[in-house]
Amino acid sequence: MLLLLAEYLQQFHKGFAVFQYLTLRGILGVLTALALSLWLGPWMIRTLQVRQIGQAVRNDGPQSHLSKKGTPTMGGALILTAIAVSTLLWADLSNRYVWVVLAVTLLFGAIGWVDDYRKVIEKNSRGLPSRWKYFWQSVFGLAAAIFLYMTAQSPVETTLILPLLKDVSIPLGIGFVVLTYFVIVGSSNAVNLTDGLDGLAILPTVMVAGALAVFCYLSGNVNFAEYLLIPYVPGAGELIVFCAALVGAGLGFLWFNTYPAQVFMGDVGALALGAALGTIAVIVRQEVVLFIMGGVFVMETLSVIIQVASFKLTGKRVFRMAPIHHHFELKGWPEPRVIVRFWIITVILVLIGLATLKLR
């Protein structure tokens, strides 16, 4: 929006041309989203408290979680508001990738909002039934996948790229739609499963988004892409603004979500942010790198799959409780220790993901 204004004002003063730079708009995107989160956060928390929109706590979970009962939830709406406003202000709104990622984020956020609303407002412990949740995730995920497939401008945009192997790429054809669907829906649910402790999901999400911003910048620049032997995706660089907005909004939310949390993001935030990461990774053809950098999300998801499969097949549980962060809590780890150690793991995995840019 403001980019269009700056382009118009260039005829009066050439200094407005500075807003053409992605890096500047990315910085402004971070600061705008951060400021909005910090400004609106206290108001949102008070509003949620007044309306008694509080978190329900499982009785069979760690006893330390009983004190969290009633903590305001659905705070993810704050994150999505900050992301949307910042992106609309600073991004090039003629870029199709910006609209795809923003639409996926808000639509998955809507699914989470309905789920949270039914749990908290209507006091329905089941929330949105799983079959309907996955149905709408599938509808929106497939819609995004088909759109990206139909609008691909070169074969590389639908090719699977394997990091570390510079001469290996796998043309997917229509299989691109299937892969994209699983990446978007899988990422969405993985982040949601991770969101069980104060700040556990949001900081890894911020770190992965920051790393994806680097991939967006490099993939959107033909010279850098050729030098680093990564796919050149025209227009992908504009997603820096979205990634930056996510980083700013996430850090602002963490201010209130850090232990002991004043607010939880709820499904409205977790489902949306996971879907956003998956969509961005697909656009810049870095699905495998997302799997690496989001290793904490993968670990949480696998722990649930293993736990359910083991119990159904053998009647025994592998972990004391799943997702795995609860397993460590029940082993006696204090909540802050679990959180910080998972953050440290994410830092390491993100650095490994970034290292794949040169290790080819």
Swiss-Prot record:
Q: In which pathway does it act?
A: Cell wall biogenesis; peptidoglycan biosynthesis
* This protein's record includes keyword Cell division: yes
**Enzyme category, top tier:** transferase
Which family does this protein fall into? Belongs to the glycosyltransferase 4 family. MraY subfamily.
Question: Which gene holds the coding sequence for this protein?
Answer: mraY
Q: Provide the Gene Ontology terms for cellular component.
A: plasma membrane
Report the InterPro entries cross-referenced here: Glycosyl_transferase_4, PNAcMuramoyl-5peptid_Trfase, PNAcMuramoyl-5peptid_Trfase_CS
Query: Which GO molecular function annotations are given, in alphabetical order?
Result: metal ion binding; phospho-N-acetylmuramoyl-pentapeptide-transferase activity; UDP-N-acetylmuramoyl-L-alanyl-D-glutamyl-meso-2,6-diaminopimelyl-D-alanyl-D-alanine:undecaprenyl-phosphate transferase activity
Give the superkingdom in one word: Bacteria
Reported EC number(s) for this entry are 2.7.8.13
The entry's function note states: Catalyzes the initial step of the lipid cycle reactions in the biosynthesis of the cell wall peptidoglycan: transfers peptidoglycan precursor phospho-MurNAc-pentapeptide from UDP-MurNAc-pentapeptide onto the lipid carrier undecaprenyl phosphate, yielding undecaprenyl-pyrophosphoryl-MurNAc-pentapeptide, known as lipid I.
Q: Which residues cross the membrane?
A: 25-45, 73-93, 97-117, 132-152, 168-188, 199-219, 236-256, 263-283, 288-308, 338-358
Q: What is this protein called?
A: Phospho-N-acetylmuramoyl-pentapeptide-transferase
Keywords for the protein's UniProt record, in alphabetical order = Cell cycle, Cell division, Cell inner membrane, Cell membrane, Cell shape, Cell wall biogenesis/degradation, Magnesium, Membrane, Metal-binding, Peptidoglycan synthesis, Transferase, Transmembrane, Transmembrane helix
| UniProt organism field | Ectopseudomonas mendocina (strain ymp) (Pseudomonas mendocina)
Location of this chain's protein in the cell:
Cell inner membrane
The cofactors named for this UniProt entry are:
Mg(2+)
